[in-house]
Amino acid sequence: MPNTNPVAAWKALKEGNERFVAGRPQHPSQSVDHRAGLAAGQKPTAVIFGCADSRVAAEIIFDQGLGDMFVVRTAGHVIDSAVLGSIEYAVTVLNVPLIVVLGHDSCGAVNAALAAINDGTLPGGYVRDVVERVAPSVLLGRRDGLSRVDEFEQRHVHETVAILMARSSAISERIAGGSLAIVGVTYQLDDGRAVLRDHIGNIGEEV
C-alpha cells in the first residue's frame, strides 16, 4: 500500500477491513522479498492512532502488512507530546496522507472516566493520568445529553480528532492544503467492523 492521497488511502483501509470482516484477509505486504525491501526505508500510507487494547490490532483489522501503516497506540488513544511528535514525524517526514483515530466499543479508559465522573472512583498511579485525559470528552458528551457508553466512546474519538487539529499546525496546515485528512473510526469488537464516525478533509465520502 504505497504513499498515495487521502482518498486512495481511506479506500484501501476500508477494503482491507471489509476483507477482515468477511473472513477473507489477503495478508498483504508480508512476503520475504517485501520484508527485505523495507530495509531501505518506509513509505506508509496511513497513520493509525488507536487505543492500546489487545483486541484492536490495526494491521489485522485493516488487513495490511509490513510498511503499510505507521501505528501509534496509547490506552484510550490519549494524546501527549510523544504522540504528537510521532504523528508529526509520519506526516512531515514520511508524507503520510491519512491519519486514522481508532477507538472501539467496550473501551476500558472511557468506562473508567465515566466511573470517575459518576462516583469519584479514580485509579492510582499513571493509570489515573489516562483517565483524567479521557474525562473531558465524557464531560462534553454529558453536557450535550449523551447517555450510552457507545455514544461517549464515539465522542472521545471526535474530541481526539479535534485535539490533533488544534494542537498541531503541521497537521492542520496539510489538511488545509488538501494533502492530508483525518478520520475518526470506532471498531466493533463482535463483528470486526471499523465504522466511520468523523472526518476532516476529503476522503471521498461523508459520514
Curated annotation (Swiss-Prot):
Domain of life: Bacteria
Entry's pH dependence statement: Active at pH 8.4 and inactive at pH 7.5.
Alphabetical GO biological process terms: carbon utilization
EC number: 4.2.1.1
InterPro entries: Carbonic_anhydrase (IPR001765), Carbonic_anhydrase_CS (IPR015892), Carbonic_anhydrase_sf (IPR036874)
Reported regulation of activity: Inhibited by sulfonamides and sulfamates.
Cofactor note: Binds 1 zinc ion per subunit.
Cofactor: Zn(2+)
Pfam family, one: Pro_CA
Keywords: Lyase, Metal-binding, Zinc
Function, in words: Catalyzes the reversible hydration of carbon dioxide to form bicarbonate.
Record note on quaternary structure: Homotetramer at pH 8.4 and homodimer at pH 7.4.
Record-given protein name: Carbonic anhydrase 2
Highest classification ranks of the organism: Bacteria, Bacillati, Actinomycetota, Actinomycetes, Mycobacteriales
Encoding gene (name): mtcA2
